[in-house]
Regions:
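ATP/NTP-dependent adenylation/nucleotidyl-transfer catalytic domains that generate, transfer
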Residues: 1-32, 42, 46-49, 54-77, ...
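Conserved G/P- and acidic residue-centered "switch" motifs that form tight phosphate/ATP-binding loops
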Residues: 37
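His/acidic metal-ligating clusters that form di-metal
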Residues: 128
Length: 292
């Protein structure tokens, strides 16, 4: 089930596939929402290479990056987003008006006085961000890039109508642990080239705890109840291979450090996967034959 990939080859495949797609569809611009997290950082690095290569080949292309912070965005997230945006985007902006817009919408959802729970307000912010990104993409005649990975897809770590929306996502089939490993290699490559701003930007992103930046929880692991995403990947891979077997073993062994991942943690992760199944089968429609 979990076949090891060649990380360097994976980077090249993603770059070449995006170049081919942009040319085929006559697209000359792409927009990426940059949070400072490792997922948007990887897409930013790849898109930087795509833009460089396309322009060097005589194909005009512009890569736009946008950071849309709110009051629930940690300062270290914004700092990482700025480092990544300035290092890898052809054009980068921080739009600080997102907080004002999201405050109005959240107040409206709470009937102008009732404080709504963090999950609802977080979903609203995620959807507002996509409104902005898609409008931005329309303005520059481009498309919106996605940053979801396979682990988050299986966990339902996205908002329907929000960050689950995108036009092109080069890394949907990568496990989160693979995203980390590819970024580590890219960071080392830039360090070897003495391109320290780019190396530092990736390193800063790697050092951040994965979080949604929407105020839903302190970080992803608080929501999941695991040590880190490497354990989560081990659990999900075990489950996909053994989902027909009843119950869980007392533990499984971490592929990283030999830690015994307990059944309690496995149960939390697998329940989250099962409870988010509707997100992976959305939207639901009826076939025409049902009406006849």
């Amino acid at each position: 089930m979990n076949q090891t990939i060649d990380y360097s080859k994976a980077s090249r495949v993603m770059i070449d596939s995006m170049k081919e797609y942009f040319k085929k569809c006559n697209l000359h611009a792409a927009v990426l929402g940059i949070s400072g997290g490792i997922d948007s950082t990887l897409v930013a690095v790849l898109m930087h290479k795509v833009s460089q290569e396309l322009n060097s080949e005589g194909y005009s292309f512009t890569f736009y990056g946008v950071s849309l912070p709110t009051k629930t965005t940690y300062s270290k997230e914004l700092w990482a987003a700025q480092l990544v945006g300035n290092a890898f985007c052809d054009n980068f902006e921080v739009n600080n008006e997102m907080e004002e817009a999201s405050s109005v919408v959240v107040d409206w959802l709470g009937n102008w006085g009732v404080k709504i729970e963090p999950l609802r307000s977080g979903n609203a912010k995620s959807r507002l961000r996509m409104i902005y990104l898609y409008d931005f993409a329309k303005k520059v005649n481009g498309i919106v890039m996605g940053t979801d990975n396979y682990t988050e897809y299986l966990l339902g770590f996205s908002t329907i109508g929000g960050d689950a929306l995108f036009d092109y996502n080069p890394m949907q089939e990568l496990w989160k642990s693979e995203v980390f490993e590819i970024c580590k290699i890219l960071q080392e490559q830039y360090a070897d080239l003495k391109d320290y701003p780019k190396a530092a930007a990736i390193m800063t992103s790697l050092a951040l705890k994965p979080m949604d930046g929407l105020g839903i929880s302190a970080d992803d692991m608080v929501q999941i109840g695991a040590r880190h995403y490497y354990d989560v990947d081990d659990i999900l891979q075990w489950y996909l291979e053994n989902q027909d077997r009843p119950g869980y073993p007392d533990y499984i062994i971490s592929s990283v450090d030999g830690y015994k991942i307990p059944a309690k943690t496995m149960d939390l992760v697998i329940k989250r996967h099962k409870n988010s199944e509707f997100k992976r089968n959305h939207p639901v429609t009826l076939s025409r034959e049902r009406y006849i």
